[in-house]
Curated annotation (Swiss-Prot):
GO terms for biological process: translation. It holds the Pfam family Ribosomal_L29. GO terms for cellular component: cytosolic large ribosomal subunit. It comes from the Bacteria. The lineage of its organism: Bacteria, Bacillati, Bacillota, Clostridia, Thermoanaerobacterales. GO terms for molecular function: structural constituent of ribosome. This is Large ribosomal subunit protein uL29.
Length: 69
């Protein structure tokens, strides 16, 4: 998910998405430990998306807005 797409979501949607991604990350790590993970790059993608969501939530909390045209 791109940062631009994330910024279009409301805070409630972001919190729900964050919860879903954390659950997915847990499942991916479990699959990795048991040797059943097909795509290990998915872990990286999920972690980065979680970081993007947390960053955008924090920006909104602080009132920071980044306009890039």
């Amino acid at each position: 998910m791109k940062a631009r797409e994330i910024r279009e979501l409301t805070n409630e949607e972001l919190l729900q998405k964050l919860s879903d991604l954390k659950a997915e990350l847990f499942n991916l790590r479990f699959q990795l430990a048991t040797g059943q993970l097909d795509n290990p790059m998915r872990i990286r993608d999920v972690r980065k998306t979680i970081a993007r969501i947390k960053t955008i939530l924090r920006e909104r909390e602080l009132g920071i807005r980044q306009n890039k045209a």
